[in-house]
Amino acid sequence: NKYGTMALSVGLSLYLGWFVPLGVALYWIVSNLFAILQTAVLNRVIDPKKYVDYEALEASRKRLHEIEALQPDRHSAAAKENARREKADYKRFFSIENKHLVFYSEKSGFYKYFKDIIDYIVTHSNVAVHYVTNDPEDQIFEVAKRQPQIHPYYIGQKKTITLFMKMDADVVVMTTPDLDNYYLKRSYVRKDIEYVYVPHGMASQILTIHKGGCDNFDTAFCAGQHHMDELREMEALYGTRKKTLVPTGYCLLDDLIADYESQPHEAHTRPVVLIAPSWQQDNLLDTCIDELIESLLQADCRVVVRPHPEYVKRFKAQAAALKERWAHVDTERLSMEMDFTSNVTIFTADTVVTDWSGIAYEFSFATLKKTLYIDTPMKVSNPDFPQCKTPPFDLDIRKRIGVCLKPEEAGEAGATVRRMLAEAPQSEAELRRIREESVFNVGHAGEVGGRYLLKQLVARAQNAKE
């Protein structure tokens, strides 16, 4: 009977249609309940507290939450607009063939390390400068409006990973170390790209860069002889291939010197002391800042506290607490500076107090004034540095361009600053001599770097013709 068969078929289908989902649901419910029971039993047998540091785990969770809170809302109108820009710029970047020169920057603040080099290139050639940045608000977009040779692209950090994998250019210039060690890889498309590392500071390469951080670059610009010596020693230590080392100098220092010398300088009736620490663990803000401020105020100094931008961003509570603790002091004697866009405070200070921040070199070499160092625990990115025979520049230079105090000696800061200022006239000539010894091509770093890049591009063009 066809109707009976149809009814049986429909009935069986309905039965299975209900039975199978219910069976699967029952399976998952029972298996999950059993897994919970199994975990509870195992936790009683093997106590996880013996193997897991729950306090550290909770601290890491809080830290992760703080970092995530710093990220922009992906669903905001601005984020959606940036996503649209990124997609368009990514497509535009790869639509251009025969790119010769590419600069990569993580954020707007890194433009200052490239500025003089790029200025030389666009002034002395018609080479197009392709500038990739992870910062949608990078100043390069405004610069490019005035200079048509510069072609800027906003590419987010994640998309930069694939951009680097597919990179097609003759020369790539960047300040980011650890090329090919982490997420930024050498091109999978072209094997003949020359990758050039530009240091964003005069600090020691064997201290501040991870082991192997420069190994995968073809060329490294060097601020001073210490960079060349340290890089060569690391090559020998690790048995890596020799890079081309270019004695360029330090572009940012050149700009700071020019800016400082172009400004009028008035003597202060009350010495101005700028406290500008790093943001590493156990920096002077977290170890001896109150004793430091108290001592300087007692010595009748005007104190300006300028925390590192990363410290303010990551440790808002500590920065706010510091500000509140000293709110009772008149701002004519003590002020907290949270605007990091200007160098006016650096230029007008009579001395700088820091721990391991590179601002010391920039201040002392630009103004020819001594720095007061607080010897907080040193930040070491490369634990192998004791194996190097070359003494780290950061350790050697401190006592030459400044005076060092231990954190427990912070109460002596006021008297120390007064003594340093009394000796300032004799210190200027000595600091000028040390600057000339320590930094290559003072006043001409951008020219030297730009000339090298143009020379490499010309050589490649000639080889291509042949």
Predicted regions, residues:
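Active-site and donor-binding regions of nucleotide-sugar-utilizing enzymes
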Residues: 102-257
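C-terminal alpha-helical cap of glycosyltransferases
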Residues: 442-466
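Catalytic binding pocket for nucleotide-activated donors in carbohydrate/polymer assembly enzymes
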Residues: 242, 351, 356-438
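Conserved catalytic-core segment of nucleotide-activated headgroup transferases in glycan assembly
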Residues: 109-126, 251-325, 407-410, 421-422, ...
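Hydrophobic alpha-helical transmembrane segments and adjacent short intramembrane/lumenal linkers
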Residues: 1-51
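Donor nucleotide-activated moiety binding/catalytic core segment of transferases
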Residues: 155-158, 317-361, 366
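Short acidic-hydrophobic, aromatic-tinged amphipathic segments that line or gate anion-handling sites
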Residues: 151-157, 248, 334-338, 401-411
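Cytosolic, positively charged, low-complexity intrinsically disordered regions immediately flanking transmembrane
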Residues: 38-87
